[in-house]
Design a protein with these regions (language model features):
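Non-catalytic terminal and boundary segments that flank Rossmann-like NAD(P)-dependent oxidoreductase
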Residues: 101-117
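SDR active-site lid
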Residues: 6-77
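A transmembrane-helix-recognition feature enriched in membrane-embedded lipid enzymes
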Residues: 87-96, 104
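Short secondary-structure boundary/capping segments
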Residues: 29, 96-98
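Conserved alpha-helical elements of the SDR catalytic core
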Residues: 1, 5
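Short-chain dehydrogenase/reductase
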Residues: 78-89
Length: 117
């Protein structure tokens, strides 16, 4: 979309944050639990809300700084990786390649490879 809109003077920025230390899950998330997804949702939530994992997350202010930079610096840069954990994941994605990275993430979060592309 960035290529198409550029001809109209519209810039696109993609912010890719990692985890963000907030209480969002505790106060806002309604997973709409369905029995078919309960095991999957519980495993995923257990990983992302683990205190050790959460210690690697960025503060909201750190992410806001990246958003502000993307919006104001005037560079022709599409992707902004925000947070140390996001940068590590992005580096792993580049190293492994997209398909191997997706399989590794599926294994970590769900215990098996993705069922559909």
């Amino acid at each position: 979309m960035a290529f198409e809109l550029n001809q109209f003077g519209i810039g696109i920025k993609t912010i890719e944050p990692g985890g963000i230390r907030t209480d969002f899950f505790a106060r806002s998330l309604d997973t709409g639990r369905h029995p078919a997804y309960e095991v999957l949702v519980n495993k995923f939530m257990g990983i992302i809300t683990d205190p050790k994992q959460m210690a690697t997350y960025s503060s909201p202010e750190q992410i806001a700084e990246v958003v502000y930079e993307a919006a104001t610096h005037g560079k022709d840069q599409l992707r902004y990786i925000a947070g140390a954990d996001a940068k590590a994941m992005y580096a792993m994605r580049l190293q492994l390649g997209e398909e191997a990275f997706r399989k590794a993430m599926a294994q970590q979060f769900f215990g098996d490879a993705p069922k559909a592309a």
